[in-house]
Amino acid sequence: MTFTGQAYALGAGTVINAIATWKGAAFGVDLKTFADVELTKESSSFIGTIEGVPHGDTTLIERSMDLVLEHFGIEMGGTVVTRSEVPLASGLKSSSAAANATILATLDALGETLEPLDAVKMGVRAAKDAGVTITGAFDDACASFFGGIVVTDNRTNELVKRTEKEMDVVIFAPDRQSFSSQTNVHNSELLAPWVDMAYDLALDGEYEKAMTLNGFLYCGALGFSTDVMMEALKCGVKGVSLSGTGPAYSALVDRKMADTLTKVWENLGTSGKVINTKINNDGLTKL
């Protein structure tokens, strides 16, 4: 007998990267990662597949399934297939989205529920176990799960603040990948006093100022060009940042500015794609 479940979770953009201080902020975007889970008592193994990435590392989604079953004391195996509108390894929280979607889909298959924050923390644990994150990415996981803009303390897994904001999001995703686990942590930690300033801005609701300061700081520490950000500022954009540990950049804008920035970023002369989306304030759900 098999049990099936489906769910999705959101990608996200960065306001404050938590690597320097373990305090972060992020916003959920209207790009989704979907998970389809099938469980069976005939097996005890977990097999994950990332659609379109035949040799992708599936440790995270397999561990996410395993933790849900372990929590409820259920001995089963199964498969999980994820498909995503979120570019992988680009700083747009594809790992958090995959973990959240898999956990919800597994709960759906079992007919079980968890408190939302418990589900988020389970995904954070799966990400740590799989070695795809440095801080656990609780900020990214909360943005992916709850939507809106979240401010967190990743050391204590505390959701400090959540705000809903109606804004468009423009993303520039270069044609290369950058994995969070390979980030230069030492360089990032040197930024701590200035990242704290950005975090204080986020606590005060000055999200655009916070993310722009964050972007210049982390571009410097991680070796990314600030040209993409400067072109956005020249257009009048107030909030633009390297997203996560890159290589993507994201900007918070109004509708009119979104059209202007899209044209500018499409003509950067850098190989990549421009994605138009918006902040998703609804959070995630089962399908």
UniProtKB/Swiss-Prot annotation:
Its EC number is 2.7.1.71. GO terms for cellular component: cytoplasm. Its main location: cytoplasm. It is found in: Cytoplasm. Coiled coil: none annotated. One of its GO terms (biological process) is chorismate biosynthetic process. Keywords: Amino-acid biosynthesis, Aromatic amino acid biosynthesis, ATP-binding, Cytoplasm, Kinase, Nucleotide-binding, Transferase. GO terms for molecular function: ATP binding; shikimate kinase activity. It catalyses: shikimate + ATP = 3-phosphoshikimate + ADP + H(+). Belongs to the GHMP kinase family. Archaeal shikimate kinase subfamily. This is Shikimate kinase. It comes from Methanococcoides burtonii (strain DSM 6242 / NBRC 107633 / OCM 468 / ACE-M). The gene is aroK.
